[in-house]
Amino acid sequence: MKLVFAGTPEVAVPALDALIASGRHEVAAVVTRPDAPAGRGRRLVASPVAERAEEAGIEVLKPAKPRDPDFLERLREIAPDCCPVVAYGALLPRVALDVPARGWVNLHFSLLPAWRGAAPVQHALMAGDEITGASTFLIEEGLDSGPVYGTVTETVRPTDTSGDLLTRLAFAGAGLLAATMDGIEDGSLEAVPQPAEGVTLAPKITVEDARVDWTAPALRVDRVVRGCTPAPGAWTTFRGERLKLVQAVPLPDRSDLAPGQLAAGKNNVYVGTGSHAVELLWVQAQGKKPMRAADWARGARITEGERVGD
């Protein structure tokens, strides 16, 4: 089939690579978000998908909005059979959805209908899911509600961050998306409507969502830290400034600290929660680079009874 691939961040690149490598489909063009300012100099930088497409000699389209007339005209000229999508980053209007003969097919990083929305991996970790996965589905105008072509499952590991899990899902999902394109082309796949039961929502994680509540159980604190790493980053406050929690582990054998109470040893930093303590392994103080929590504690000269989160 002739394809136009839509995607923007690094997590979409494995799927683009899989489609290019398949040899069965022609990736005629790529649609991605416009170049965005990055770094200290705020220099405009192309998206990872745009860079990969340019390396492969594929035409790159960067509409400010997917309803732009010039973009729609070019899309109609290309006349794709199908448009696979991975983390494109903009809502597709009906006028765009109607262009490809076989629609737009999205790779979503959850087992639909669970975790519909912008942050499925983060929400799966924060909810304590033991199994998650990826789904391919036909895009409709509802939120991730279209009929599903296929799924792949992935076991959540005890130390997974959202970054770890998303990386694995990106590669597993790439194979799923390529197989979905094959099945659509040869007629062996039929999309199945999502069940009405089991729908959960995964809205974008806000900065406030990532703030650690030290009165919550240690297991919840652990899930928030892992679910919000690397972005937006779990955090608390210390002496009136924000402190990012990069890595922490629950300690079920220690329960002598009040919620938020700090205890610093030579090589360890502990914080009390609503159940037992957690050990902080890596933190990032405001305006600093990530560092070992023990090094941070020595520099901060933590005194007995000090707390985080006040």
Curated annotation (Swiss-Prot):
GO-annotated molecular function: methionyl-tRNA formyltransferase activity
Catalytic reactions of this protein: L-methionyl-tRNA(fMet) + (6R)-10-formyltetrahydrofolate = N-formyl-L-methionyl-tRNA(fMet) + (6S)-5,6,7,8-tetrahydrofolate + H(+)
Keyword Transferase attributed: yes
Family according to the record: Belongs to the Fmt family.
EC number in record: 2.1.2.9
SUPFAM superfamilies: FMT C-terminal domain-like, Formyltransferase
Gene it is expressed from: fmt
Protein name, as recorded: Methionyl-tRNA formyltransferase
Taxonomic source organism: Streptomyces coelicolor (strain ATCC BAA-471 / A3(2) / M145)
Gene3D superfamilies cross-referenced by the UniProt entry: 3.40.50.12230
An annotated GO BP: conversion of methionyl-tRNA to N-formyl-methionyl-tRNA
Gene Ontology CC annotations of this record: cytosol
